[in-house]
Amino acid sequence: MRNIHSIEFYTGSKEELLPGFEKDFPYIASRAELDKYIGGYVPWHWHRTVELFYMESGSIEYDTPGGKILFPAGSGGMINPNVLHMTKAISQREKNIQLLHIFDVSLLAGEHGSRIEQKYIAPVITAPQIEVIPLFPGNAEEERILKLLAASFRLSSDEFGYEIKLREALTEIWLMLFERSRSMREKKGEHNKSNDKIKLMMIYIHEHYREKIS
């Protein structure tokens, strides 16, 4: 797991560049030390991958087109592919550290168009109303997912069968998220999260709203 203190973009885009992301195993694990980012925040960005995260310590605020959500230590969640988002370190008393699984859905679904993709993956990632699936302590079902999520970050890449064990852990978590998202999937979305023009417009507005309009 790499410690990260900054974000990289594809040239001319706000799509995040993911160093170390390989086609033969489309996955990276990161430990984001938010306090070391410039300004203590990760600017607006998006990526084509799933973002599954757990708050190790501190608290952060996620901002998406749908609103803001605060995640304290012990909470976590999933960010759907192609969702524009930014994060900001909130806690002033302890380090703001976030653990992240970043992966392409093919890691779980296998070949594009597979039965697994059609039944369990596509219904979530193609639902425009699902930007974030938040998970908080205090809810029994969500606590079960959080426990599995925290444990998944303790897997070592040096141990025998790591890739298979990791995929198994992520698959179990995904199935629970799939069930958790049922009510969200039944609601109709009103925005198109894959519209790049809207992404760029929102980024421009948020980056320049303090400037005087001439």
What are these regions (language model features)?
Residues 1-76, 82-83, 118, 129:
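Generic protein-terminus/edge-of-domain signal
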Residues 28, 123-124, 148, 155, ...:
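Residues that form generic nucleotide/phosphate-binding pockets
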Residues 39-46, 63, 88-90, 110-113, ...:
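Short histidine-centered beta-strand/loop micro-motifs
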Residues 82-107, 113-116:
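Ligand-binding loop in jelly-roll beta-barrel domains
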Residues 131-142, 155-212:
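Short, Lys/Arg-enriched, Trp-marked, Pro/Gly-tolerant hinge/linker segments that flank
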Residues 146-150, 201:
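Short, Lys/Arg-enriched alpha-helical recognition elements, typified by the DNA-recognition helix
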